[in-house]
A protein has these predicted regions:
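Fold-level recognition of mixed alpha/beta catalytic cores in primary-metabolism enzymes, strongest
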Residues: 119, 123-231, 399-416
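Short, solvent-exposed loop/turn elements at beta->coil junctions and helix N-caps
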Residues: 57-62, 180-182, 243-247, 364
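Acidic/His- and Gly-rich active-site-bordering loop/insert found
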Residues: 2-114, 137, 141-142
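Metal-dependent amide/peptide-bond hydrolase catalytic core
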Residues: 1-4, 199-424
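Phosphate-handling active-site elements
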Residues: 97-98, 109-111, 131-147, 232-239, ...
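Short, solvent-exposed loop/turn segments at the edges of secondary structure
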Residues: 68, 101, 189-193, 274-278
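Short glycine-aspartate micro-motif
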Residues: 83-85, 113, 170-176, 193-195, ...
Length: 424
């Protein structure tokens, strides 16, 4: 691999090429399990570039009659080299209120592209496709196959990537094109959802001493659980209720958020079908490497049993992972050595594309999980990388999603370089 060869590839990624595909993608609404039109657009584009394209039908994990589709583009190598998957999702985040521009207008002004999915994650898919297109146009030959996989339903726990794996799609290496401010996330948190149900017999304002002794309002039971775990988004201190080893690249983690609490009352409209004797709490922990489902379950059981010893009326039921999240929002943390060839190749690509020193570590994806977690858990060494930085917003998900075109172009060139270096 010579400098002239890689310079020739990088030069074939142009602002106009990236902007045109990015704007076309933003203008196609593609909410989760409604990605068919954008899937067809990307499939046709990749086919025109010269990739072999297969369309994979994906069934909704909770609604068997609902289906969507995702393309698998393959640039076939000559053989004898490692294969690389470029993975990004076609479904953007939640469309929040408060947009000041048309979320599907793909406005381009002052170097910024605006719209739903501008960097989460249509921009990532666009950068991947444009990077591979540059390799094809350069005439370079690769030994290993390159798979370009725009997937559906990331926002449904990575259902599209899980469907890829179930379909037998594999690669030796993968880059998950998630927004990371063009930093290389070789380490990322994981996620596990936890469900706790508390119970108590109903008690009215006139009662016996025995009945009162056996009663603890289920909401108040949940309040005690919340108190002992601590405030949402506060770092969980080492040596406390949760067992873990802090990771130097994931400061402030593990941490958690309390997501939902449900309690019914027999005199009020029932929204959940639950009995008024019970209260449900759902919360999530963003985990660090080394933590396991079994370890977290043991920690939670110890915390809850501690409450029971102090309050005999405490009555709980614990599920980890929460029912319905086992094959979605239950993802292991990932940690790839900085010396891994995937990391070093992409770092050199970022250096060449940007002219600046690359940043490797957890910073750009701090707190996020991506489909890269799923790929890595399936045995495919993966990093997460892409344009866009959610720290520029006051909230996330957000209105007015936007990304600098220059960052998308840099990402496309960095990926083109890494792909050529790894697969040539």
């Amino acid at each position: 691999m010579t400098r002239d060869e890689t310079d020739g590839i990088l030069a074939r990624v142009t602002d106009g090429q990236v902007l045109a595909l990015e704007q076309a993608a933003i203008r196609i609404p593609s909410t989760t399990f409604e990605e068919q039109r954008i899937a067809d657009h990307f499939a046709n584009y990749m086919s025109d570039v010269g990739l072999t394209v297969e369309m994979l039908e994906v069934t909704h994990p909770a609604k068997p009659g609902v289906k969507t589709r995702q393309p698998i583009g393959r640039l076939r190598g000559m053989g004898g080299g490692p294969s690389l998957m470029l993975n990004g999702h076609m479904d953007p985040g939640v469309e929040m209120s408060g947009w000041t521009v048309d979320p599907y207008g793909a406005k381009f002004e002052d170097g910024w592209v605006w719209g739903m999915g501008a960097h989460d994650d249509k921009g990532g898919v666009v950068a991947a496709i444009c990077g591979v297109e540059a390799i094809v146009k350069s005439g370079a030959r690769l030994r290993g196959d390159v798979l370009v996989c725009p997937v559906v339903a990331h926002k449904l726990g990575g259902a599209g990537t899980r469907a890829l794996i179930a379909h037998g799609v594999r690669a030796d290496l993968a880059i998950n094109m998630e927004h990371s401010a063009n930093t290389i996330a070789n380490v990322c948190v994981g996620v596990v959802m936890i469900h706790v149900k508390t119970r108590a017999p109903e008690l009215f304002f006139r009662y016996s001493a025995e009945a009162k002794a056996a009663y603890w309002n289920p909401i108040e039971q949940q309040c005690e659980i919340v108190r002992r775990i601590g405030p949402s988004l506060d770092p969980i201190p080492p040596g406390g209720w949760l067992t873990f080893t802090p990771h130097p690249d994931l400061p402030g983690f593990p941490t958690h958020t309390f997501d939902t609490v449900h309690k019914e009352h027999y005199y009020q409209k029932n929204y959940t079908g639950m009995s008024s004797r019970e209260c449900d709490l759902l919360f999530q922990i963003r985990t660090v490497p080394g933590q396991t489902i079994g370890g977290i379950r043991a920690d939670m059981t110890r915390l809850l049993d501690g409450i029971k010893r102090e309050h005999p009326a405490f009555d709980y039921e614990l599920a980890i992972p929460a029912a319905g999240t086992e094959h979605g929002w239950c993802q292991d943390p990932m940690d790839i050595p900085r010396s891994h060839r995937l990391v070093t190749a992409l770092a050199e690509g970022q250096r060449r594309a940007s002219g600046a020193e690359p940043v490797v570590g957890g910073w750009g994806r701090l707190g996020n999980v991506g489909d890269g977690n799923i790929l890595n858990q399936a045995g495919i060494p993966t990093v997460q990388y892409g344009a866009g930085d959610i720290r520029i917003y006051k909230e996330w998900p957000t209105p007015d999603e936007r990304v600098p075109l220059a960052d998308l172009v840099t990402a496309a060139r960095a990926v083109a370089y890494a792909t050529y270096r790894l697969c040539a």
